[in-house]
């Protein structure tokens, strides 16, 4: 069977930490044929069929070894994993429209679902699971929200890995310049959430495969005096068993994920609150698999192969 991964340039991926490369290694161990392509290599022919400039992976050790580029019809692949990192910009949007034309293979995740469910905004479908949240480009509305909740987190809507996140209080001397910068002087909406104090204990990444969670979450603990727990920002990752509240959140969102063909998702949970639903290229598998006293690879094969 032939599997394709659509990824960012492979030389940009970190061999020891990247989830896409971990998935490729897992499938290679099962003697599956694994290929990769970048968005730039995807084409729609005049016949309506899609093709890609692909590279067949030979092995992944301390580096990825692969064959020369060849052009393949996407019909050649049983499953296609779309794992391009945000931001979800015009190029990503165009990729989703192109891939939506392809009906022959199973696409993980659905291109239309990736397009329709922003990783920050999709939590708004579950108001009872989230902290008080404002989405606005209005400086006055944001200031009133900050005044009400005393301490808030500001997030850009189309970014990842903790980039562009600010902690603000009503008396912050930089409040005006921060709001002007983040909203582009009132032209761009941002997300503002009540600060969740449990972030000091960490931010959990829970991987869901076909709506089913791995038995362990990756708890990312922020550095001292830091509110961003992302590993890319220096957070420390340790695995934890899922709590009763984690399972309640998963049960609530599972049917939504399945109905929208979101087969590979990473949700973020702080304390009792759902904070993000990551659908583009969820990470955390390497850290979970390396610490869990069980065969995570077998679970992945059973759910995704």
Spell out what each predicted region is:
Residues 1-4:
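Extreme N-terminal starter segment of soluble prokaryotic enzymes
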Residues 7, 13-16, 224-225, 241-305:
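ATP-dependent carboxylate activation and anion-phosphoryl transfer catalytic cores
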Residues 111-115, 220-222, 270-273:
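Short glycine-enriched loops at secondary-structure junctions
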């Amino acid at each position: 069977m032939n599997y394709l991964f659509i990824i960012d340039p492979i030389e940009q991926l970190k061999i020891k930490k990247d989830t896409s490369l971990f998935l490729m290694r897992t499938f290679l161990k099962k003697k599956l044929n694994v290929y990769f392509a970048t968005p730039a290599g995807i084409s729609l022919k005049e016949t309506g069929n899609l093709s890609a400039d692909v590279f067949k992976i030979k092995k992944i050790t301390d580096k990825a070894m692969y064959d020369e580029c060849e052009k393949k019809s996407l019909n050649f692949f049983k499953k296609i994993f779309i794992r391009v990192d945000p931001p979800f910009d015009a190029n990503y949007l165009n990729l989703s429209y192109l891939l939506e034309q392809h009906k022959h293979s199973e696409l993980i995740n659905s291109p239309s679902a990736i397009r329709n469910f922003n990783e920050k905004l999709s939590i708004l479908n579950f108001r009872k699971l989230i902290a008080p949240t404002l989405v606005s480009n209005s400086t006055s509305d944001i200031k009133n929200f900050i005044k009400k909740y005393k301490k808030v987190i500001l997030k850009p809507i189309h970014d990842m890995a903790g980039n562009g996140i600010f902690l603000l209080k009503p008396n912050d001397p930089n409040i005006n310049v921060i709001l002007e910068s983040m909203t582009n002087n009132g032209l761009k909406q941002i997300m503002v959430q009540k600060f969740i104090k449990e972030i000091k204990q960490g931010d959990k990444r829970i991987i869901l495969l076909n709506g089913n969670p791995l038995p362990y979450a990756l708890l990312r603990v922020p550095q001292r005096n830091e509110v961003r727990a992302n590993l890319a920002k220096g957070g420390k990752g340790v695995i934890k068993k899922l709590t009763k509240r984690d399972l309640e959140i998963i049960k609530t969102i599972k049917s939504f994920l399945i109905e929208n063909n979101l087969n590979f998702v990473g949700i973020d949970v702080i304390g009792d609150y759902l904070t993000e639903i990551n659908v583009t290229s969820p990470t955390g598998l390497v850290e979970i698999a390396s610490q869990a006293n069980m065969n995570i690879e077998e679970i992945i094969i059973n759910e995704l192969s």
